[in-house]
Amino acid sequence: MEPLNNQILDCLKQRDPFAVATIMTHKGSTPRTSGSKMIVLKDRTIYGTIGGGLVEALVMDACMKLIDKHQSRIKEFSLDKELKDGLDMVCGGNLTILMEVFVPDPGLTGIFKALVSLEKEGKKGFLVSKIDGFSKSDFSTRKCLVLPDTTITGQPLIPKPLMDEICDNLFTGTFPVLYNHGLEEYIIEPIHPSDTL
């Protein structure tokens, strides 16, 4: 299986906008867990899965619309009785899914080149996305890669207090978290060498 970030880098090199759907949180019985990802291309090609079924189809449809608008969204899905009826689903939990649109540009491609190199070297880091707008509505993001030694690839989007928190290993999970720092919102994703589709 090709590592996820290698696949994202390949998609960035194609220069067409695409989306990455990531399960940020899950509660109860769900087909996949937090951190599961799926790349969605404009032609509806997918790489990876967030669990299949109706939720995956709904996420794909939402991603298509978001790609056209160059906007991202965080949305909750409930695998309740209404959604499950007639679908032979046994899950009954809730998912919060980040549907993030990637619009290729040299800076973003450079960040993912550095990230892929980091993973090949077996090192850790943090992919930080600053939300432009508010997470309760559609938004866009700007990214940078942060290493534990405070080296940054990309724009320096992070205020020093947040940089200190990141580098003090306060974010040790395996999936992205939405983090409020004052009035600004960030998505902080710990990077581990084993991230795959």
What are these regions (language model features)?
Residues 1-197:
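Segments forming oxygen-rich coordination pockets for charged ligands
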